[in-house]
């Protein structure tokens, strides 16, 4: 999660999930981004049962689970997620946690939107651990710091900060990396994920890099 956009949240979540699957873990991905980038990448855009049903209380959990070609299961996104928030805050703050807690998976990875919306706060409330991907630019690092601060209100802990699209030749990027190192220490994954056209190619192909 990162409150800034364009940091590689969906790509990181998908690659991490497939890696867990390769190690024999039973993995569920949950797309809580109303834009549905993960759902689109996995070819499940026309799903009639999706994560919004958790928030509306209209669906039994098992009816939302879908198998994918990437060896992980998925609960798809829906544009209706834009409606989650406002006066629903108190009622829905734990609803995602309550629903996911019933699933029998080794690992559940939730992909979120940017920002700190009420929807994203339900994701924070559901998380045991939080991974913060970030580009090495000022706005992305600022967004990473916002999420780290916001997570202090919830039981989940920041497990890792993951630099993405890293260009080791960038002076500004190296300065941002030094700032992240000072702030997060050992939980900062170094050297991070390098900038590469392979990531865009994978998105176009509708698959992970693994």
Description of each model-found segment:
Residues 1-210:
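P-loop NTP-binding core
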């Amino acid at each position: 999660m990162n409150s800034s956009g364009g940091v590689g949240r969906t790509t990181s979540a998908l690659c991490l999930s497939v890696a867990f699957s390769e190690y024999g873990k039973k993995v569920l991905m949950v797309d809580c981004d109303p834009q549905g980038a993960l759902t689109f990448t996995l070819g499940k855009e026309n799903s009639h049962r999706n994560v919004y049903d958790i928030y509306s209380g209209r669906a039994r959990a098992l009816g939302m689970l879908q198998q994918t070609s990437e060896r992980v299961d998925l609960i798809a996104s829906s544009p209706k997620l834009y409606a989650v928030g406002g006066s629903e805050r108190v009622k829905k703050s734990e609803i995602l946690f309550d629903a996911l807690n019933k699933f029998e998976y080794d690992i559940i990875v939730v992909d979120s939107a940017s920002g700190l919306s009420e929807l994203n706060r339900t994701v924070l409330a559901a998380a045991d651990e939080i991974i913060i991907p970030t580009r090495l630019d000022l706005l992305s690092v600022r967004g990473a710091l916002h999420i780290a601060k916001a997570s202090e209100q919830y039981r989940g802990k920041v497990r890792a900060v993951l630099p993405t699209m890293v260009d080791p030749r960038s002076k500004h990027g190296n300065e941002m990396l030094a700032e992240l190192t000072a702030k997060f220490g050992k939980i900062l994954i170094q050297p991070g994920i390098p900038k590469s056209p392979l990531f865009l190619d994978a998105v176009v192909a509708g698959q992970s890099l693994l």
